[in-house]
């Protein structure tokens, strides 16, 4: 059996926050604003995985109204979901994700993100692809107001 899921997330850039994308701290004057650490890439991946198993969305498991998840490490949230997925007998076929940001440039960090995500999903790095793009200064990402991410995951049983 194969299952496909897709995920999307967006967070606003704000001062006085660390920028964490794909589980990697990126030096920048702003970070992403959110209830947790606001890791936009890991949130999109987590949502894609939850979608692939037909279990709703990330907000169902980790509501932003629950103080237990205040400033939560998104890598730990992904690991919690992945444990459920593995317990159900699924493994990663492949994952493809895109980060959409005007600044900072993500390309120097993509390989580190790929390795970290593969580690979190107990997968080979060849099963994980992460890429970065801009919107050519269009929209909220182009105006440097926020960062978005998309993810597609294939699970196999």
From Swiss-Prot:
Keywords: Isoprene biosynthesis, Lyase, Metal-binding. Involved in the biosynthesis of isopentenyl diphosphate (IPP) and dimethylallyl diphosphate (DMAPP), two major building blocks of isoprenoid compounds. Catalyzes the conversion of 4-diphosphocytidyl-2-C-methyl-D-erythritol 2-phosphate (CDP-ME2P) to 2-C-methyl-D-erythritol 2,4-cyclodiphosphate (ME-CPP) with a corresponding release of cytidine 5-monophosphate (CMP). Binds 1 divalent metal cation per subunit. This is 2-C-methyl-D-erythritol 2,4-cyclodiphosphate synthase. Belongs to the IspF family. 4-CDP-2-C-methyl-D-erythritol 2-phosphate binds at residues 9-11, 35-36, 57-59, 62-66, 101-107, 133-136, 140, 143. GO terms for molecular function: 2-C-methyl-D-erythritol 2,4-cyclodiphosphate synthase activity; metal ion binding. The keyword Membrane does not apply. It is an enzyme of class 4 (lyase). Its cofactor is a divalent metal cation. The record marks 35, 134 as: Transition state stabilizer. NCBIfam families: ispF. PANTHER family: 2-C-METHYL-D-ERYTHRITOL 2,4-CYCLODIPHOSPHATE SYNTHASE, CHLOROPLASTIC.
């Amino acid at each position: 059996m194969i299952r496909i899921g897709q995920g999307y997330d967006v967070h606003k850039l704000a001062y006085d926050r660390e920028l964490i994308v794909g589980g990697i701290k990126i030096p920048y004057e702003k970070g992403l604003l959110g209830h947790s650490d606001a890791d936009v890439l890991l949130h999109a991946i987590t949502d894609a995985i939850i979608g692939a198993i037909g279990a709703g969305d990330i907000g169902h498991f980790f509501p932003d109204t629950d103080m237990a998840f205040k400033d939560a490490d998104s890598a730990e949230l992904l690991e919690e979901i992945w444990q459920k997925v593995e317990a159900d007998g699924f493994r990663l076929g492949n994952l493809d994700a895109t980060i959409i940001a005007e600044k900072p440039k993500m390309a120097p960090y993509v390989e580190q993100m790929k390795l970290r995500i593969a580690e979190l999903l107990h997968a080979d790095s060849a099963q994980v692809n992460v890429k970065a793009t801009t919107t050519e200064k269009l929209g909220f990402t182009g105006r440097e107001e926020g960062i978005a991410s998309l993810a597609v995951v294939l699970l196999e049983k």
